[in-house]
A protein has these predicted regions:
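Phosphate/pyrophosphate-binding loop motifs in nucleotide- or prenyl diphosphate-using proteins
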Residues: 2-194
Length: 194
Protein backbone atom coordinates (compact mmCIF):
# COMPACT_ATOMS: atom_id res chain seq x y z
CA UNK A 1 0.00 0.00 0.00
CA UNK A 2 1.38 3.40 -0.97
CA UNK A 3 1.59 6.14 1.68
CA UNK A 4 -1.11 8.77 1.48
CA UNK A 5 0.19 11.92 -0.18
CA UNK A 6 -0.20 15.31 1.41
CA UNK A 7 -2.57 17.65 -0.35
CA UNK A 8 -0.63 19.71 -2.86
CA UNK A 9 -1.37 22.98 -1.03
CA UNK A 10 -0.05 21.65 2.31
CA UNK A 11 3.13 20.25 0.74
CA UNK A 12 3.75 23.52 -1.08
CA UNK A 13 3.08 25.58 2.02
CA UNK A 14 5.59 23.63 4.08
CA UNK A 15 8.33 23.67 1.46
CA UNK A 16 8.07 27.35 0.55
CA UNK A 17 9.30 29.55 3.40
CA UNK A 18 9.03 33.03 1.86
CA UNK A 19 5.46 33.56 0.63
CA UNK A 20 5.11 37.37 0.92
CA UNK A 21 1.43 36.85 1.81
CA UNK A 22 1.96 38.38 5.25
CA UNK A 23 3.61 41.56 4.06
CA UNK A 24 0.32 43.43 4.50
CA UNK A 25 0.15 42.72 8.25
CA UNK A 26 -2.06 39.66 8.07
CA UNK A 27 -1.33 35.97 8.44
CA UNK A 28 -3.13 32.83 7.35
CA UNK A 29 -4.85 30.45 9.76
CA UNK A 30 -5.16 26.71 9.32
CA UNK A 31 -8.71 27.05 7.97
CA UNK A 32 -7.54 29.37 5.18
CA UNK A 33 -8.85 32.60 6.73
CA UNK A 34 -6.58 35.58 7.33
CA UNK A 35 -6.26 37.65 10.50
CA UNK A 36 -4.21 40.64 11.60
CA UNK A 37 -0.80 39.72 12.98
CA UNK A 38 -1.56 41.71 16.13
CA UNK A 39 -4.77 39.79 16.89
CA UNK A 40 -5.18 38.02 20.23
CA UNK A 41 -5.24 34.68 18.39
CA UNK A 42 -1.85 35.27 16.77
CA UNK A 43 -0.47 36.56 20.07
CA UNK A 44 -1.57 33.31 21.75
CA UNK A 45 -0.14 31.17 18.94
CA UNK A 46 3.16 33.05 19.23
CA UNK A 47 3.27 32.66 23.01
CA UNK A 48 2.72 28.90 22.72
CA UNK A 49 5.41 28.72 20.02
CA UNK A 50 7.83 30.66 22.24
CA UNK A 51 7.06 28.30 25.11
CA UNK A 52 7.77 25.28 22.91
CA UNK A 53 11.08 26.82 21.81
CA UNK A 54 12.01 27.59 25.42
CA UNK A 55 11.38 23.96 26.34
CA UNK A 56 13.55 22.98 23.37
CA UNK A 57 16.34 25.10 24.83
CA UNK A 58 15.88 23.35 28.18
CA UNK A 59 16.09 19.98 26.41
CA UNK A 60 19.52 20.96 25.06
CA UNK A 61 20.80 20.61 28.65
CA UNK A 62 21.82 17.34 30.32
CA UNK A 63 18.63 16.17 32.05
CA UNK A 64 17.53 13.01 33.83
CA UNK A 65 15.87 10.72 31.25
CA UNK A 66 12.38 10.87 32.82
CA UNK A 67 12.49 14.68 32.74
CA UNK A 68 13.65 14.76 29.11
CA UNK A 69 10.96 12.27 28.07
CA UNK A 70 8.29 14.30 29.85
CA UNK A 71 9.43 17.54 28.20
CA UNK A 72 9.52 15.95 24.74
CA UNK A 73 5.93 14.78 25.20
CA UNK A 74 4.99 18.31 26.25
CA UNK A 75 6.56 19.72 23.08
CA UNK A 76 4.25 17.50 21.02
CA UNK A 77 1.27 18.66 23.10
CA UNK A 78 2.24 22.30 22.56
CA UNK A 79 2.46 21.73 18.81
CA UNK A 80 -1.07 20.30 18.99
CA UNK A 81 -2.19 23.33 21.00
CA UNK A 82 -0.72 25.65 18.38
CA UNK A 83 -2.70 23.73 15.77
CA UNK A 84 -5.86 24.08 17.84
CA UNK A 85 -5.36 27.82 18.06
CA UNK A 86 -4.67 28.15 14.34
CA UNK A 87 -8.00 26.57 13.37
CA UNK A 88 -10.98 28.37 14.95
CA UNK A 89 -13.37 25.86 16.52
CA UNK A 90 -10.86 22.98 16.44
CA UNK A 91 -10.07 21.13 19.68
CA UNK A 92 -6.80 19.20 20.04
CA UNK A 93 -5.99 19.51 23.75
CA UNK A 94 -8.37 17.50 25.93
CA UNK A 95 -8.94 16.64 29.57
CA UNK A 96 -6.63 13.65 29.05
CA UNK A 97 -3.74 16.02 28.32
CA UNK A 98 -4.44 17.92 31.54
CA UNK A 99 -4.68 14.70 33.56
CA UNK A 100 -1.34 13.55 32.16
CA UNK A 101 0.29 16.75 33.41
CA UNK A 102 -1.36 16.43 36.82
CA UNK A 103 -0.06 12.86 37.08
CA UNK A 104 3.44 14.03 36.16
CA UNK A 105 3.32 16.77 38.82
CA UNK A 106 2.40 14.16 41.44
CA UNK A 107 5.03 11.69 40.24
CA UNK A 108 7.95 14.15 40.18
CA UNK A 109 6.86 16.01 43.30
CA UNK A 110 6.71 12.78 45.35
CA UNK A 111 10.53 12.73 45.58
CA UNK A 112 10.85 16.37 46.66
CA UNK A 113 10.69 17.82 50.14
CA UNK A 114 7.67 19.87 51.12
CA UNK A 115 8.04 23.62 50.67
CA UNK A 116 7.17 25.96 53.52
CA UNK A 117 8.54 29.10 51.83
CA UNK A 118 8.88 30.45 48.32
CA UNK A 119 12.05 29.50 46.48
CA UNK A 120 14.22 31.69 44.30
CA UNK A 121 14.36 30.64 40.64
CA UNK A 122 17.83 29.34 39.89
CA UNK A 123 20.27 26.61 40.76
CA UNK A 124 21.73 24.75 37.83
CA UNK A 125 21.50 26.15 34.31
CA UNK A 126 18.89 23.49 33.45
CA UNK A 127 16.77 24.32 36.51
CA UNK A 128 17.04 28.03 35.70
CA UNK A 129 15.83 27.34 32.15
CA UNK A 130 12.91 25.34 33.59
CA UNK A 131 11.98 28.42 35.62
CA UNK A 132 12.20 30.58 32.48
CA UNK A 133 9.93 28.08 30.69
CA UNK A 134 7.54 28.26 33.67
CA UNK A 135 7.23 32.04 33.32
CA UNK A 136 6.76 31.78 29.55
CA UNK A 137 4.00 29.23 30.22
CA UNK A 138 2.29 31.72 32.53
CA UNK A 139 2.49 34.38 29.81
CA UNK A 140 1.06 31.97 27.23
CA UNK A 141 -1.81 31.25 29.62
CA UNK A 142 -2.49 34.99 29.96
CA UNK A 143 -2.53 35.28 26.15
CA UNK A 144 -5.15 32.53 25.97
CA UNK A 145 -7.25 34.27 28.64
CA UNK A 146 -7.09 37.53 26.62
CA UNK A 147 -8.12 35.64 23.49
CA UNK A 148 -11.01 33.99 25.36
CA UNK A 149 -12.45 37.43 26.15
CA UNK A 150 -13.30 37.88 22.46
CA UNK A 151 -13.57 34.39 20.96
CA UNK A 152 -13.99 30.77 22.05
CA UNK A 153 -10.98 28.98 23.55
CA UNK A 154 -11.02 25.37 24.67
CA UNK A 155 -11.29 25.03 28.44
CA UNK A 156 -8.73 22.22 28.48
CA UNK A 157 -6.21 24.41 26.63
CA UNK A 158 -6.23 27.02 29.40
CA UNK A 159 -6.07 24.40 32.14
CA UNK A 160 -3.22 22.67 30.29
CA UNK A 161 -1.03 25.79 30.37
CA UNK A 162 -1.88 26.39 34.02
CA UNK A 163 -0.85 22.83 34.97
CA UNK A 164 2.22 23.05 32.75
CA UNK A 165 3.60 25.99 34.71
CA UNK A 166 3.10 23.95 37.90
CA UNK A 167 4.93 21.01 36.34
CA UNK A 168 7.81 23.18 35.15
CA UNK A 169 8.22 24.48 38.72
CA UNK A 170 8.40 20.90 40.00
CA UNK A 171 10.80 19.91 37.19
CA UNK A 172 13.13 22.80 38.09
CA UNK A 173 13.30 21.46 41.64
CA UNK A 174 13.73 17.90 40.33
CA UNK A 175 16.65 18.90 38.11
CA UNK A 176 18.35 20.76 40.96
CA UNK A 177 17.89 17.78 43.28
CA UNK A 178 19.33 15.39 40.65
CA UNK A 179 22.40 17.66 40.44
CA UNK A 180 22.77 17.77 44.23
CA UNK A 181 21.64 21.41 44.50
CA UNK A 182 19.40 22.64 47.31
CA UNK A 183 16.45 24.96 46.80
CA UNK A 184 17.31 28.54 47.79
CA UNK A 185 14.49 29.76 49.99
CA UNK A 186 13.30 33.35 49.76
CA UNK A 187 13.99 35.22 52.97
CA UNK A 188 12.23 38.47 53.70
CA UNK A 189 15.13 39.70 55.83
CA UNK A 190 17.38 39.49 52.73
CA UNK A 191 15.22 41.86 50.65
CA UNK A 192 16.40 45.38 49.86
CA UNK A 193 19.80 46.94 49.18
CA UNK A 194 22.81 45.79 51.18
Amino acid sequence: MLPRRLPRKMGHRLSKIVTRTGDNGTTGLGDGSRVAKDSTRIDAIGAVDELNSTIGLLLAEALPDPVAQCLTSIQHDLFDLGGELSIPGHVAVTDAHVTRLEDAVERFNADLGALKEFILPGGTRAASLAHVARTVSRRAERSLVRMAASEPVGDAARRYLNRLSDLLFVLARTVNRAAGRQDVLWRKDRSGPR
